[in-house]
Design a protein with these regions (language model features):
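Amphipathic, well-packed alpha-helical segments that form the structural scaffold of globular domains
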Residues: 24, 47, 454, 458, ...
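Long insertion/accessory domains within large nucleic-acid-processing enzymes
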Residues: 679-716
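Contiguous, well-ordered alpha-helical segments that form the cores/surfaces of helical PPI scaffolds
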Residues: 229, 501-514, 534, 691
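Short, conserved micro-motifs enriched in small and acidic residues
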Residues: 13-14, 498-502
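Conserved catalytic cores of very large enzyme subunits
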Residues: 91-497, 518, 522-683, 687-688
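Charged, amphipathic alpha-helical regulatory modules used
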Residues: 1-109, 710-715
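Short, solvent-exposed positions on alpha-helices
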Residues: 37, 57-60, 499, 523, ...
Length: 716
């Protein structure tokens, strides 16, 4: 009887069906090519060869036979997929795979990890510790948790399994903190009970403590859905407390009858000072805190209140102070005010603040000044957002991940206290390369990739569904997400659409160029791009019905992925003009960064894609220094309100510590950041703030993202 010698030297009976099954797996993989009957034909031929050989074959010899026969039968795609599968399996059998990666972090030679996140300073030991833990965690996940076909697809650049360095722990991606409940009903931090704050200053301090705790228990961004509205009652509390103190001073210190008019005037002035101090506390705390993730908390402050709100006056004061503090900036080590990366600010445009005759237009004017100087705030149009989200206006989680509308048992929409389980992204340009100009072939391959993405996303859900609340008390027991008991499972919060789980995508522009020969802004290109978006939406809708999970379509930020996908495809397919030669792929549905288009046409074009990318989207315009032309900024802001749900403006805000230059630091021919005055290229002596992909980065970027930033053209 024929026998096969396994890797450990043991022998098992020869089974040609196992050979055929392995070949079929490679054919049906993300990078293989199925040919009916081929697997069985090759298995039969190998069995015939082994019979003639009249001796046992090693597993290695069989694998070599499979590879060469696939080449012989003109199926190199499956041959490569088979080799990739073998490599992944070999990797999983290894016991120690992280030494080189960890040492590379310590000696700063592991560039791919060091530059992966532009808000993590890898020179700092606390950040290094997080990155080292990430490499070890990623290694365990690759060898023990992630199925081989998903891992092979990830390694080949067919898909990207985001945040692989966190999945061995029961953590989710991003959320909307239920801050209002935590401040109103109290919370617990590190086992210490925190009661309802009695003043605005204390509320601000508690808020930053909550933000830090939440950031350490998840790996993505967090947002406060209406920071002005939520903190406004505490301004009133401070005012009333201060007013009583002023009256007491009038009577007891100055021996006078209470003068209520004067007392109110003094109390309001002191309250404004407390609001200023409180907002300053939030801004400085967020930018100086270091979480267990090795970076400042990635937090978004969403500014939105309605004019008939009981505390509208106080909410407006908070919004005003947030904007004034951001315009001022924070000091760097050279004692110069610079643009802070966090918190991200979002300002909602609505009827009460968008026209010159509206009561809160002065806040919009202040927001325009802030944008011109500090890039934030970004803008959401209440009018356009309501069209896409069943009449609701709410914050994205982090920079762009949006929840789907969801109603509680009473039929009320709920957004605060909800979250996203994670992301898997598709490489749309790679499909275009493989399709070789055929639209039919493109969608055939896309459907196969979607099957893989579905499986990968379900893995994320399955890793969380049996988790108990004890893993992160701030989230699950003390109000950020829920108020469960110790030991209670979180599973019910994952299903029914309460939480979202995201199918990401990158490179609509490149995919369209490969299939239609034109940009996604062209007539044919736009039609094809929309077909892709429709197919992706069809998939998530099908999965939602099938699994009862809140799948969403998400325009991937792709901070490092833009470089990773492009580099993998260039290595595999060579240099392809306008595709792999750039060093990056274009984010999500965006217009190519090099394409000449004005801000109004760009927003108008991309607004149609936002309607289809409701699980995550944002559009931007590159503008010059407009601090002396605020009316033009206001004109563009008005256009956002009328035409697009969510948009932002990118300006330049840099500083050279060598010569004191304050202006735009550019990328030179060597892809290095260089001061135009003294030509300093030492990254340790440059502060460069750029929009990375929805938020600001300040610790530099990988090679691909740097090239993308360099290529950006102005839209005005």
């Amino acid at each position: 009887m024929l026998q096969v010698i396994k890797r450990d030297g043991t022998k098992v009976p020869f089974d040609k069906n196992k050979i055929a099954l392995a070949i079929e797996k490679a054919e049906h993989s993300s990078t293989g090519l199925y040919e009916e009957g081929l697997a069985q034909r090759i298995a039969d031929e190998i069995e015939e060869y082994a019979t003639k050989l009249q001796k046992d074959m090693t597993i290695y010899a069989i694998e070599d036979q499979v590879y060469y026969k696939l080449i012989e039968y003109h199926n190199p795609a499956t041959a490569r997929a088979y080799e990739g599968y073998k490599a992944v399996q070999a990797f999983k059998r290894r016991q120690n795979t992280t030494d080189d990666d960890v040492i590379g972090l310590l000696d700063r030679s592991n560039v791919s990890v060091l530059d992966e996140n532009s808000n993590k300073d890898a020179a700092i030991v606390s950040t290094q510790r997080d990155l080292i833990a990430g490499e070890v965690s990623k290694d365990i996940a690759r060898r023990k948790l992630i199925p081989t076909d998903i891992l092979e697809a990830h390694d080949s650049g067919a898909i990207h399994f985001h945040d692989m360095d966190y999945i061995i722990q029961p953590m989710f991606n991003c959320c909307l903190i239920n801050l209002e409940d935590m401040l109103t009903n109290g919370t617990v931090i590190n086992g210490k009970k925190i009661d309802t704050p009695k003043s605005f200053q204390v509320a601000c301090t508690v808020t930053t403590q909550i933000i830090a705790q939440v950031a350490s228990g998840q790996y993505g961004g967090q947002s406060i859905n209406g920071i002005d509205r939520i903190l406004a009652p505490f301004v009133r509390k401070s005012y009333e407390k201060i007013l009583n103190n002023v009256i007491e001073e009038q009577v007891e210190t100055y021996g006078m009858e209470p003068n209520m008019e004067k007392a109110r005037e003094i109390a309001w002035k002191r309250t404004r000072k407390e609001v200023k101090d409180g907002i300053q506390t939030i801004q400085y705390q967020i930018n100086t805190l270091m979480t267990t993730n090795g970076q400042s908390p990635f937090v978004t402050l969403f500014m939105y209140f309605k004019p008939d709100y009981e505390y509208a006056k106080e909410a407006a004061l908070i919004t005003e102070e947030i904007l004034r503090q951001r315009i001022k900036g924070v000091k760097n080590e050279a004692d110069v005010y610079i643009t802070p990366a966090f918190p991200k600010l979002i300002y909602v445009l609505d009827e009460h603040n968008v026209t010159p005759d509206s009561p809160y237009y002065y806040l919009t004017e202040l927001a325009a000044q802030c944008t011109a100087k500090r890039m934030y705030p970004d803008y959401i149009s209440a009018k356009k957002m309501k069209e896409n989200y069943e009449g609701n206006v709410f914050s994205p989680m982090g920079c762009r991940s949006f929840l789907s509308p969801w109603k509680d048992e009473k039929g009320n929409y709920k957004f605060d206290g909800r979250f996203n389980m994670g992301v898997v992204s598709l490489n749309l340009p790679q499909i275009g390369i493989l399709a070789r100009g055929s639209e039919e072939k493109y969608f055939e391959i896309l459907d196969k990739r979607l099957e893989l993405a579905e499986k990968a996303l379900l893995l994320r859900y399955n890793l969380l569904k049996d988790v108990v609340s004890d893993v992160s008390p701030i989230h699950w027991q003390h109000g950020a997400i829920a108020r469960l008991k110790k030991g209670e499972k979180i599973g019910r919060f994952l299903t029914g659409g309460y939480a979202t789980i995201s199918l990401g995508y990158i490179g609509i522009y490149e995919a369209t160029r490969l299939i239609t020969g034109e940009s996604n802004t062209g007539e044919k290109g736009r039609v094809f791009a929309m077909k892709i978006m429709d197919r992706l939406n069809d998939a998530i809708n099908l999965w939602h019905d099938k699994h009862n999970l809140g799948f969403g379509l998400y325009g991937t930020p792709a901070e490092s992925l833009t470089n990773r996908f492009s580099s993998l495809d260039r290595a595999r397919f060579g240099v392809i003009e306008d595709i792999t030669d750039k060093g990056y792929y274009t984010n999500s549905y965006h217009v190519n960064v090099r394409e000449e288009i004005n801000v109004f046409d760009k927003f108008n074009f991309e607004s149609e894609f936002q309607k289809k990318s409701t699980g995550g989207c944002i559009s931007y315009a590159e503008i010059p220094n407009m601090t002396n032309n605020i009316p033009a900024v206001l004109t563009m802001i008005q256009y956002i309100y009328d035409h697009i749900s969510y948009a932002e403006f990118n300006t330049k805000s840099d500083y050279c510590h060598e010569c004191g230059f304050d202006g735009e630091i550019k990328v030179n021919e060597n892809n290095e950041w260089e001061c135009p005055r003294c030509h300093n290229t030492n990254r340790d002596k440059l502060t460069v703030i750029r929009r990375t992909c929805g938020y600001l980065g300040e610790n530099f970027w990988n090679e691909g993202r740097t090239k993308e930033i360099k290529d950006r053209v102005m839209h005005i």
